[in-house]
């Protein structure tokens, strides 16, 4: 991918997120309020175990960019924000680095500015094992993230048209790299059978990457001179739908990204079964508008607000949010009916009033 195209992606992605709060399927998910369910904020621990590491928070900065001068500045700002807030951070696709090793610095800055944090290297599904290992080595990465973007590719005039080998390649990478593998969709969602297949292929984490956030089909369509693909603007499943669809798949961690707009969306995603949540476009817009200090301030506010939400809901850990009652309505409820998911059961999960569930007040 050329540096110009990388910069185009950044510009279009920011345009989708700046100065608006789009409606998405997280609006169809609500918490049933229980006025006596609250705990003490001091009892809330936001830490989670993901991909063999202890993360201080269930929130991370998801894959964005790299491979240009502008991308170097962006990655520096993201790395500084990650360092100061304790958030893990994922690189953009390292494809540009594989074509031109001279671009290494635009990615390596993520580790240079964040020497002790969790850094994740990102490659596409056609990366060779040698390339994947080089990506991990370049960033001293704690995990390898493989992105799936078939829909984006078909909208790109110059995009890939061959996807049959992707499953075999993913298995090869998962078996051959020295770090845990994360597989993420870029905004069109992972289905239940896909997540189960990834688990069986040796993948440690599935990032469902659902519809509702940055729309890469729309970004690529905006770059096309002809042959409009705007009919794909609503392709795929939303992040809440994907989490519900994969809730019963065991043996693999789930990450929610795609359409996370606020700390409340983070809490909803965790309550739907995510082990962690990733944010890309919204944090990118904040960085470009307010700089690294502005992003640090925003992330710290999100973490404080997430802790407050967990306190009111009586959730001492992110996993405890899965026992909170959820009201699932609208198109997400319709999706559940079609996929054989008991949405009503999510409204009757909590037992906060039972003596065995409450800490002594003494």
UniProtKB/Swiss-Prot annotation:
The keyword Flavoprotein applies. HAMAP family: Idi_2. GO terms for molecular function: FMN binding; isopentenyl-diphosphate delta-isomerase activity; magnesium ion binding; NADPH binding; oxidoreductase activity. It holds the Pfam family FMN_dh. It comes from Nocardia farcinica (strain IFM 10152). Its EC number is 5.3.3.2. FMN binds at residues 63-65, 93, 122, 184, 214, 259-261, 280-281. GO terms for biological process: isoprenoid biosynthetic process. Homooctamer. Dimer of tetramers. The keyword Flavoprotein applies. Its main location: cytoplasm. Signal peptide: none annotated. This is Isopentenyl-diphosphate delta-isomerase. Substrate binds at residues 5-6, 152.
């Amino acid at each position: 991918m050329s540096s110009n195209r990388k910069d185009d992606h950044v510009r279009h992605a920011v345009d989708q997120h700046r100065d608006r709060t789009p409606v998405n399927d997280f609006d169809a998910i609500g918490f049933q309020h229980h006025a006596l369910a609250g705990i003490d904020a001091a009892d809330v621990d936001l830490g989670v175990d993901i991909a063999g590491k202890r993360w201080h928070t269930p929130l991370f900065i998801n894959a964005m960019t790299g491979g240009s001068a502008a991308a170097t500045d962006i990655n520096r700002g993201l790395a500084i924000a990650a360092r100061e807030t304790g958030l893990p951070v994922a690189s953009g696709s390292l494809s540009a680095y594989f074509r031109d090793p001279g671009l290494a610095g635009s990615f390596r800055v993520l580790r240079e500015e964040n020497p002790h944090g969790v850094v994740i290297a990102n490659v596409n599904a056609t990366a060779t094992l040698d390339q994947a290992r080089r990506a991990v080595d370049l960033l001293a990465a704690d995990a390898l993230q493989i992105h799936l973007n078939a829909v984006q590719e078909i909208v790109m005039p110059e995009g890939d048209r061959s996807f049959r080998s992707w499953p075999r390649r993913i298995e090869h990478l998962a078996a051959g790299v020295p770090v845990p593998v994360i597989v993420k969709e870029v905004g069109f969602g992972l289905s239940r059978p896909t997540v189960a297949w990834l688990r069986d292929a040796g993948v440690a984490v599935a990032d469902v990457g659902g519809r509702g956030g940055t729309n890469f089909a729309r970004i690529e369509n905006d770059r096309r001179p002809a042959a409009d693909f705007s009919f794909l603007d609503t392709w795929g499943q939303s992040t809440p739908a994907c989490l519900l669809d994969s809730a019963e798949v065991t043996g693999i961690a789930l990450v929610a990204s795609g359409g996370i707009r606020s700390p409340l969306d983070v809490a909803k995603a965790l309550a739907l079964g995510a082990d962690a949540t990733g944010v890309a476009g919204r944090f990118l817009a904040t960085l470009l508008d307010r700089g690294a200090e502005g992003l640090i301030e925003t992330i710290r506010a999100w973490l404080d607000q997430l802790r407050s939400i967990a306190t009111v809901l009586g959730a001492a850990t992110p996993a405890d949010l899965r026992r909170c009652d959820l009201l699932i309505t609208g198109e997400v409820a319709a999706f559940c009916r079609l996929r054989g998911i008991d949405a009503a059961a999510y409204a009757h999960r909590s037992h906060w009033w039972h003596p065995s569930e409450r800490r002594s007040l003494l």
